[in-house]
Amino acid sequence: MPKIELSSKWSCDGRELKPKSGATSQNTWVYDGRYLKPKFSATSKNTWVYDGHELKPQFSANSQNSWVIEGNKIKPQFSSNSSNTYEFNGHSILVAFGQVVLKLW
């Protein structure tokens, strides 16, 4: 089972996820305890909702683009298996979001 890892090129304090070099409000993601969204120009189409159990797009969410959190694991709601189920490995939901949803690294 793969593990969530924060790329050495990114930083995250639990509230903001941004590149270590060249960070701007346009490539920084923020988490306010419910929503994960770009720091600048957030819309319902690029905002995700996290309720403590599911991570899904605010707009047009379905079982194929939603993730389920169970204990210290995050996995796709649909067709999950050992290769697409990740251990949080001590990282926040924002780091997991950057790795498995946005695929930033």
Protein language model features and the residues they cover:
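Repetitive, compositionally biased segments used for assembly/scaffolding
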Residues: M1-W105
